[in-house]
Amino acid sequence: MNTSQPALHTSMLTSLPLLARGKVRDNYAVGIDRILMVASDRLSAFDVIMGEPIPGKGALLTQMALFWFDKLGPKGLNLCPIHLTGDAPESVVTAAEVPQVTGRSMLVKRLKPLPVEAVVRGYLAGSGWKEYQHNGAVCGVKLPAGLQNASKLPEPIYTPAAKAAAGDHDENITFEQTVEMIGLDLATRIRDISIAIYKAASEIARAKGIIIADTKFEFGLDADGTLTLMDEVLTPDSSRFWPAESYQEGINPPSFDKQFVRDWLEQVQVNGKPWNKTPPAPRVPDEVIAKTAAKYQEALTRLIG
């Protein structure tokens, strides 16, 4: 991971109007039809932003997202229109602000976001495994009996979520509920495109020694109503990546993401008690930051080289 640049916890561009700060990205308006997305080095876990950044994380997430947009969009498999404009982020900020955006930003079309998180699961893991143990289904999708933790599913399943307000948890919903929200045509297209992207990406990643257990996509509509893939795509922040060589059904594989931080937060004590997963977050030790950075870097190195 490139740590030669100082870590960027929060971008401070004054030449463009700030639209929003998400858990990781800061979005700025560029005219009325474009957005500059700056991926900071912030880390969130349990929907709480940590005070300590992960040096190089924003650049890594951007590089990986651009890799996937290239593979899956019009230049590659052409599975779906994408939100990239092709314009250089550096071209819309002042010279003094260039270091804040270089390598960690995307200049994208301003879309109307759809209120559905398009989640695709190819393996049983995390909250899906917990739900399956309880009722034999995941988000209303009935699954065969006898599956174990980390089992590969017979076919990838689509388990959408409703986007929550900032700071809240996304809510798992059924496909039928997405139809009520956005109509049958859009709901069906999002489902079918999401599964197609997941299958294609899984093959590409598997050849590089990475299993994509699950992932989430976001879509929006452009001025012409064209369904467009947006935000980040297939990064360790939006996906569960496992090393293929250590995969074993029945156990939690190590993952190339912030699981290391999550595990540390699960056992850390604050004033003699377990942290209650509300702000402020406990201070993350340098060792945990370094190991988390190494996990992200390993995923990128495997995928891109």
Swiss-Prot record:
InterPro entries per record: SAICAR_synt/ADE2_N, SAICAR_synth, SAICAR_synthetase_CS
Any Gene Ontology biological process: 'de novo' IMP biosynthetic process
Catalytic reaction equation(s): 5-amino-1-(5-phospho-D-ribosyl)imidazole-4-carboxylate + L-aspartate + ATP = (2S)-2-[5-amino-1-(5-phospho-beta-D-ribosyl)imidazole-4-carboxamido]succinate + ADP + phosphate + 2 H(+)
SUPFAM superfamilies (UniProt xref): SAICAR synthase-like
Gene Ontology molecular function: any one: ATP binding
Biological or metabolic pathway of the protein: Purine metabolism; IMP biosynthesis via de novo pathway; 5-amino-1-(5-phospho-D-ribosyl)imidazole-4-carboxamide from 5-amino-1-(5-phospho-D-ribosyl)imidazole-4-carboxylate: step 1/2
PROSITE patterns: SAICAR_SYNTHETASE_1, SAICAR_SYNTHETASE_2
Family affiliation: Belongs to the SAICAR synthetase family.
Keywords for the protein's UniProt record, in alphabetical order: ATP-binding, Ligase, Nucleotide-binding, Purine biosynthesis
E.C. code: 6.3.2.6
Organism annotation: Albidiferax ferrireducens (strain ATCC BAA-621 / DSM 15236 / T118) (Rhodoferax ferrireducens)
The protein's name in its UniProt record: Phosphoribosylaminoimidazole-succinocarboxamide synthase
One Pfam family hit: SAICAR_synt
Annotated disulfide bonds: none
GO cellular component, one term: cytoplasm
